[in-house]
């Protein structure tokens, strides 16, 4: 299994329910085709560097996952035909140095989420 990262941008006009439904849809495509999702990073709604399909803003997500190579073509196909996705990028981590960076990123994100939850529970 290879290490990958997919970043995708959703239309800013979607409601929170629609955004979470699309995120679950992408995660389902990954898991049904044999991927192991390591972490999901919701980056929120941000201003785009330039207009994409008449939108100036977009809701960003990054998913770190391990998958067989044949999954990537299916993931690309699904993201291309999904109207709510305005742009996506799939990155493959190949050599040992890149894989070490991938592991650090995916584990660091998990650790940060645990720290945030712990600080929220002690405050409230």
Swiss-Prot record:
GO terms for cellular component: cytosolic small ribosomal subunit. It comes from the Bacteria. One of its GO terms (molecular function) is structural constituent of ribosome. SUPFAM superfamilies: Ribosomal protein S6 (SSF54995). HAMAP family: Ribosomal_bS6 (MF_00360). Belongs to the bacterial ribosomal protein bS6 family. This is Small ribosomal subunit protein bS6. It comes from Campylobacter lari (strain RM2100 / D67 / ATCC BAA-1060). The lineage of its organism: Bacteria, Pseudomonadati, Campylobacterota, Epsilonproteobacteria, Campylobacterales.
């Amino acid at each position: 299994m290879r290490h990958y990262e997919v970043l995708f941008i959703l239309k800013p006009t979607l409601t929170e329910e629609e955004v979470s439904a699309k995120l679950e849809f992408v995660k389902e495509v990954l898991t049904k085709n044999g991927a192991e999702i390591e972490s999901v990073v919701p980056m929120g709604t941000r201003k785009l560097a330039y207009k994409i399909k008449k939108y100036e803003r977009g809701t960003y997500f990054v998913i770190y996952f391990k998958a067989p190579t044949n999954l990537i073509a299916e993931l690309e196909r699904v993201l291309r035909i999904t109207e709510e996705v305005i742009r996506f990028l799939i990155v493959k981590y190949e050599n040992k140095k890149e894989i070490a960076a991938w592991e650090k990123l995916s584990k660091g994100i998990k650790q940060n989420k645990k720290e945030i939850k712990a600080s929220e529970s002690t405050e409230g």
